[in-house]
């Protein structure tokens, strides 16, 4: 009887629950052609339940009692909210295309265009995607997101340098970094000042001065049809960064705070003091036995008299470290620590028909996992524009950044902290200052360096981009851009008497160095945009550009300080100040450029560009060079026979060819470097000038590196662009590489900068994206990319090695048929 009652109660409850919800069914179709919208989302507003349309566009959703609003969404279509009528169980929906999404605007060089009209290989990342991982710098936000773009962090320290390569390395000795353009203006930095010590390879990240929260979008230009408009600086690709403007509607105030913790996930297993002493003793015994040597046992566990003092001195043995009589040190525990980071962002923005404004501030404090390392940044940005008349608009975008980077000695050839944590003997005392236990000059006490070494980099950066834009009539715009940037880096270094650099007889080592750079850009640009008879669209850009860069540096090194308390703050106290050094230089670049985009029937797309650059870096006869490109694309998905297949929602084929250049050499590489020198004449010494022999002789025949690139690609979209796939195949060859060649020393020199050698890169890039759920409050998508690049050297007269012993790169072999970075061993 009891079981029967429970059964009846469960049956009644089941019927009551079914009565509390209604099953609504229907079909979701395209408003234009009536095709089913596969994968369209249906959500019950306020209930958290929903459904997805099947291959026929049909859906079925349970609507709880009291809920009567359904929300329909699909990629590429406008979202709809529909209220159910009382008792309604069938609801068929037609959805209209979201033209704003379909006509997504992508920034390209010297302009912008609809994504559907692109003929080149361009990848765009929006702010919401960039900020998903809360990156500290822009470079970190790009890691792993774009096919063919390799982001490597040179050093794991906060604020350390990050290198970006697009479609492989093009050169041996010149920079392989892409050109960075911020709001239409080239972004430059003066780099890291030196310390006067070889082997200290710490690097700084210039893009870390830009707050990622200020970014609206980033476009990566990869093929030559997209980069040729930048001529002599586009060979390594171009990264276009657009900062945020004011959002439409009411004034918007936003604040965010982010906190994080970093720590070493897994430390390496190291020998303790007992095991280390045992192995050292065994090594000495084997050496004596098999090499007939007479080496003393390093850990004998015996006493002997010190002849200098007459006292008995005990040398510990392995057992002394096992029983704790003598401490055993794991240097990783002494060097690494848990690091904390905090970041605060405040922004105010707004816009109307008359203009826009966006003002933001950022504070970042990131400590490193190595003791006494970290990075602090304070930044401010103001982006303002105003229409002072219907046909004239003015605006400016200004930013200022102050940062402090406390550098640990983590990327150093000698005496590095990480190296010391792995190689310094576990038997050495924690505060060992004698360095008697130093294995070799590559390894020193890491604990001492985290407490007794100072290396700080202070950076102040100002960047502005201002414009005046005039619209004489509907289809023509004339724009004047003025860009200015100023950067100064100051580096303060002090190694006290506990370190290898500062120990007796050096008695403290101090270095103070700074460098600065300022860059002025003037651009006059005219843009003509016209549509004829609906089937013909033409966009033409013509521009003149002038850029001037000034830079300078100075440095001072001193040793022999009476004490360590004042560190580098009192350089006059040093007994042995070295001769100060300084430098100054200037470069200029003049350019004429143009580009034309033609769209026929929204199916056939054509692009052509041309740029003529003149650089002060080269000698007369080689100052000017031309760079051109062309591209075509076919939007096959607009053809009726493709539409009839009912397979592709987007299908576009692309092909391009173009040439770009590289002028990344010194400002005066084609000129003689002179220094004051004395020379004998008529039996007496006379003062004059002589060549700096280590610089090499002048080479007036130097010319640009030239990169020629072919690219073919296809863009595909399925199920109303819910699934997107992009495939690119490329081949590029860089010729006339700028590098040093050895010359007979009878000339008075040992090497000379010249053009020789080639590098080819060929590869495949595949990018896919799947929109699983799209809605007003919930979005779920998947991204994936993979790329393959093959790099090969050719045109060398013989084998050679990478230059720069202090960088420890002389193990890299450069041989015809082999890739850049080939390591030569024994």
Regions found by a protein language model. Give the residues of each.
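Short, glycine-/polar-rich solvent-exposed loops and beta-turns at beta-strand/coil boundaries
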Residues: 55, 83-88, 152-160, 212, ...
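Extracellular/periplasmic, surface-exposed regions of secreted and cell-surface proteins
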Residues: 130, 177, 342, 377, ...
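Short, polar/charged loop or turn motifs at beta-strand boundaries
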Residues: 28-31, 121-144, 152-156, 165-171, ...
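Periplasm-facing N-terminal accessory domains of Gram-negative outer-membrane beta-barrel systems
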Residues: 7, 14-104
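Extracytoplasmic beta-strand/coil segments of soluble accessory domains associated
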Residues: 60-62, 140-189, 217, 227-244
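N-terminal periplasmic "start-of-domain" segments of outer-membrane beta-barrel proteins
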Residues: 41-58, 106-131, 159-163, 191-201, ...
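Residues embedded in well-ordered regular secondary structure
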Residues: 145, 157-162, 172-179, 187-204, ...
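Short acidic/polar hinge/loop motifs at secondary-structure boundaries
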Residues: 59-62, 185-222
């Amino acid at each position: 009887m009891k079981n029967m009652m429970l059964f009846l109660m469960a049956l009644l409850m089941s019927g009551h629950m079914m009565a509390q919800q209604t099953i609504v069914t229907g079909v979701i179709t395209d408003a234009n052609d009536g095709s089913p919208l596969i994968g369209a989302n249906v959500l019950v507003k306020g209930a958290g339940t929903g459904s997805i349309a099947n291959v026929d566009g049909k859906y079925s959703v349970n609507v709880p009692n009291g809920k009567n609003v359904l929300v329909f969404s699909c990629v590429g279509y406008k979202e709809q909210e529909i209220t159910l009528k009382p008792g309604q169980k069938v609801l068929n929906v037609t959805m209209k295309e979201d033209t704003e999404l379909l006509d997504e605007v992508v920034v390209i060089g010297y302009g912008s265009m609809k994504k559907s009209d692109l003929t080149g290989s361009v990848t765009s990342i929006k702010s919401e995607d960039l900020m998903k991982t809360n990156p500290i710098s822009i470079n970190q936000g790009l890691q792993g997101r774009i096919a063919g773009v390799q982001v490597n962090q040179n050093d794991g320290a906060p604020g350390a340098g990050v290198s970006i390569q697009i479609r492989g390395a093009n050169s041996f000795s010149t920079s392989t970094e892409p050109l960075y353009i911020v709001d239409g203006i080239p972004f430059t930095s003066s780099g890291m000042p030196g310390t006067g010590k070889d082997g200290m390879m710490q690097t700084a990240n210039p893009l870390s001065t830009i707050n990622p929260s200020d970014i609206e979008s980033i476009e990566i230009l990869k093929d030559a049809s997209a980069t040729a408009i930048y001529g002599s600086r586009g060979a390594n690709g171009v990264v276009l960064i657009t900062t945020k403007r004011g959002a439409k509607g009411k004034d918007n105030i936003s604040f965010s705070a982010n906190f994080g913790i970093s720590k070493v996930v897994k430390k390496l297993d190291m020998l303790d003091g007992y095991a280390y002493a045992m192995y050292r003793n065994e090594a000495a015994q084997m050496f004596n036995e098999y090499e007939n040597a007479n080496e003393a046992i390093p850990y004998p566990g015996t006493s002997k008299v010190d002849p200098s003092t007459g006292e008995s001195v005990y040398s510990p043995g392995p057992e002394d470290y096992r029983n704790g009589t003598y401490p055993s040190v794991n240097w990783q525990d002494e060097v690494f620590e848990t690091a904390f980071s905090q970041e605060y962002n405040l922004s105010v923005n707004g816009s109307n028909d008359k203009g826009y404004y966006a003002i933001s501030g950022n504070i970042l404090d990131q400590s490193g996992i190595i003791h006494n390392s970290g990075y602090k940044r304070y930044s401010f940005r103001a982006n303002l524009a105003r229409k002072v008349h219907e046909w004239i608009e003015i605006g400016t975008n200004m930013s200022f950044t102050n940062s402090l980077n406390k550098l640990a000695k983590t990327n150093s050839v000698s005496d590095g902290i990480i190296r010391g944590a792995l190689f310094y003997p576990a038997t050495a005392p924690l505060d060992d200052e004698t360095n008697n236990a130093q294995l070799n000059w590559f390894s020193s006490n890491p604990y001492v360096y985290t407490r007794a070494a100072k290396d700080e980099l202070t950076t102040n950066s100002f960047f502005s981009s201002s414009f005046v834009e005039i619209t004489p009539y509907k289809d023509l715009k004339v724009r004047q851009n003025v860009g200015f940037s100023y950067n100064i880096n100051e580096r303060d270094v002090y190694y006290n008497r506990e370190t290898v650099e500062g120990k007796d007889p050096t008695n403290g080592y101090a270095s103070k160095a700074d460098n600065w750079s300022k860059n002025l850009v003037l651009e006059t640009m005219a843009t003509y945009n016209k549509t004829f008879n609906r089937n013909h669209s033409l966009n033409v850009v013509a521009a003149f550009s002038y850029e001037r860069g000034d830079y300078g540096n100075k440095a001072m090194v001193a040793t022999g300080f009476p004490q360590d308390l004042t560190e580098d703050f009192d350089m006059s106290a040093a007994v042995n100040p070295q001769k100060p050094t300084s430098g100054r230089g200037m470069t200029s670049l003049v350019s004429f450029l143009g580009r034309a985009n033609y769209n026929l029937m929204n199916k056939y797309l054509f692009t052509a560009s041309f740029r003529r650059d003149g650089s002060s870096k080269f000698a007369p006869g080689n100052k000017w060079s031309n760079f051109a490109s062309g591209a075509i694309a076919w939007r096959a998905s607009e053809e009726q026979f493709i539409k009839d297949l009912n397979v592709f929602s987007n299908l576009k084929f692309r092909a391009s060819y173009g040439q770009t250049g590289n002028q990344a050499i010194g400002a005066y590489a084609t000129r003689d470097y002179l220094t004051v020198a004395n020379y004998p004449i008529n039996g007496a010494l006379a003062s004059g000038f002589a060549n700096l022999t280590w610089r090499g002789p002048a080479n007036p025949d130097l010319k640009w590196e030239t990169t020629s690139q072919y690219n073919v690609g296809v863009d595909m979209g399925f199920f109303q662009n819910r699934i997107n796939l992009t495939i690119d195949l490329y081949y590029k060859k860089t010729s006339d590489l700028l590098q040093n060649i050895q010359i007979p020393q009878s000339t008075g020199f040992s090497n000379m900068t010249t053009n020789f050698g080639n590098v080819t890169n060929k590869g495949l890039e595949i990018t896919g994206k799947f929109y699983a759920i799209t809605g007003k409050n919930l979005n779920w998508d998947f991204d994936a990319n993979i790329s393959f690049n093959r790099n090969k050297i050719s045109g060398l007269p013989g084998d050679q090695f990478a230059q720069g012993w202090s960088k420890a790169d002389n193990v890299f072999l450069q041989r015809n048929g082999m890739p850049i970075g080939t390591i030569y061993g024994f």
